[in-house]
């Protein structure tokens, strides 16, 4: 048994310049692990609580009372004494001890950010002690599947100060033989998209996740540019065959749902400000109308996946969406399911989705995250490993995606070091796998959830 000898947390900054927590764990046998916790902008109401310094003695340390020194103190003064002396390889025991220490359903006492930082650092320390890559430690010797990247090349919604209400417009390079070739293809599409935007007079500033954030007149205009960029790069906008590049959308519909209707507030405001409101243009939808709108997009564009197409409270919207389009398209739950096993069970029973987005900080421990992934996969769903909009140089999710053979990873565009770090880690993992056996990249076949 290799004991944990030291646990230390500190306050650092994430990719948006907001405070976040970093945790270091040391073991008796010389193991060391360090983890940085991400943070979301558009969050589900049922997510585990990210503890900030609002109304505490640390409140004025940072802008908006967004410090995390309370969470840091909870690690150093409450969690550390309880896990020092425990075996670093007993991940589930340590995670369960922290859950019990907190004692609340959403980890609001100690903070999900405090608990997750320790949970991930413990796993990394154990892997380091064994001189083993993290993905090998978590997944064993079997995983060789590299994930298809979902690259968020056009940002909107809460991730950008532009006119788009849909949060993410992504490309998925499917028709390629290796992860590196897929990334090379995405690189060409990304830079050709920039060229086309500039040629058409659009700005090429980027949003939180490294994608471009132009002020388009419609979501369709964004999709048109994606199709043109794919073609300009010499690839096939579609799902199948050599050089196929598909499109994926994260609508993040909870952000434009007012409790009764779905309202494209940003597009509507931009249209009115420019005095370009078209009498036939529609900005407000009920659930059925929004479903029909998605149907029009799916018929016109090579969209293979839509995430959070309806608000987290609109279960009937999700059920109807999955029933109508789930055989041929990936219907992903994020805000709906928040990486929570109990909520996922409900989604499975209701057949509301055929895929779940996995975000470590939505649930707050590595063990609970793995439980959600395994339940989804056992139920015939895909599990898409995801970053958050507030990220760092931490690359845990790259290893996790390979460890669990998720087949898909969503970690931003080909811009901003906090996003590129994950892609670089995946390139290293692919090289490592090829040195021992052969890394697998299967493109369209990762969608085993589609009929």
UniProtKB/Swiss-Prot annotation:
- Primary location class: cytoplasm
Which UniProt key words apply to this protein? Cytoplasm, Glycolysis, Lyase, Magnesium, Metal-binding, Secreted
The record's GO CC annotations read:
cell surface; extracellular region; phosphopyruvate hydratase complex
Substrates-to-products reaction catalysed: (2R)-2-phosphoglycerate = phosphoenolpyruvate + H2O
Pathway it works in: Carbohydrate degradation; glycolysis; pyruvate from D-glyceraldehyde 3-phosphate: step 4/5
Task: Identify which residues the record assigns to the active site.
Answer: 209 (proton donor), 359 (proton acceptor)
Q: Which Gene3D superfamilies does its entry note?
A: Enolase-like C-terminal domain, Enolase-like, N-terminal domain
What is this protein's function per UniProt? Answer: Catalyzes the reversible conversion of 2-phosphoglycerate (2-PG) into phosphoenolpyruvate (PEP). It is essential for the degradation of carbohydrates via glycolysis.
This one is known as Enolase
Q: Which organism is it from?
A: Mesomycoplasma hyopneumoniae (strain J / ATCC 25934 / NCTC 10110) (Mycoplasma hyopneumoniae)
């Amino acid at each position: 048994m290799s004991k944990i000898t030291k646990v230390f947390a500190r306050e650092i900054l994430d990719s948006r310049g907001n405070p976040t927590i970093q945790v270091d764990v040391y073991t008796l046998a010389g193991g060391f692990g360090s983890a940085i916790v991400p943070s979301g902008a558009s969050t589900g109401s049922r997510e585990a609580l990210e503890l900030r310094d609002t109304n505490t003695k640390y409140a004025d340390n940072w802008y908006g009372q967004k410090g995390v020194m309370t969470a840091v103190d909870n690690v150093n003064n409450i969690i550390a004494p309880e896990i020092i002396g425990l075996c670093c390889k007993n991940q589930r025991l340590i995670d369960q001890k922290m859950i019990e220490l907190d004692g609340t359903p959403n980890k609001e006492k100690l903070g999900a950010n405090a608990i997750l930082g320790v949970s991930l650092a413990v796993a990394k320390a154990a892997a380091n002690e064994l001189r083993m890559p993290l993905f090998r430690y978590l997944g064993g010797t079997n995983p060789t599947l590299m994930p298809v990247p979902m690259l968020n090349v056009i940002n909107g919604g809460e991730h950008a100060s532009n006119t788009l209400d849909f949060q993410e417009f992504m490309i998925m390079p499917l028709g390629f033989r290796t992860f590196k070739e897929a990334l090379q293809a995405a690189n060409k599409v990304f830079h050709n998209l920039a060229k086309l935007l500039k040629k058409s007079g659009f700005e090429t500033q980027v949003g939180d996740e490294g994608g471009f954030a132009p002020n388009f007149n419609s979501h369709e205009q964004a999709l048109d540019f994606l199709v043109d960029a794919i073609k300009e790069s010499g690839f096939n906008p579609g799902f199948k065959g050599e050089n196929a590049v598909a499109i994926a959308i994260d609508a993040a519909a909870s952000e434009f749902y007012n409790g009764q209707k779905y309202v494209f507030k940003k597009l509507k405001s931009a249209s009115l400000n420019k005095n370009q409101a078209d009498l036939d243009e529609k900005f407000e939808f009920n659930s059925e109308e929004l479903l029909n709108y998605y149907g029009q997009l799916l018929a016109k564009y090579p969209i293979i996946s839509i995430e959070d197409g309806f608000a987290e409270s609109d279960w009937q919207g999700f059920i109807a969406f999955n029933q109508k389009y789930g055989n041929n398209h990936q219907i992903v739950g994020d805000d709906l399911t928040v990486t929570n096993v109990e909520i996922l069970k409900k989604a499975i029973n209701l057949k509301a989705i055929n895929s779940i987005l996995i975000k470590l900080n939505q649930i707050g421990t590595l063990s609970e995250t793995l439980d959600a992934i395994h339940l989804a996969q056992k139920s015939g769903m895909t599990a898409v490993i995801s970053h958050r909009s507030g990220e760092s140089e931490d690359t845990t999710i790259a290893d996790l995606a390979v460890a669990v053979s998720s087949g898909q990873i969503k970690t931003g565009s080909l811009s901003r070091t906090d996003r590129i770090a994950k892609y670089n880690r995946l390139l290293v993992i692919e090289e490592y796998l090829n040195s021992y056996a052969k890394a697998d990249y299967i493109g369209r076949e990762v969608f085993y959830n589609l009929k």
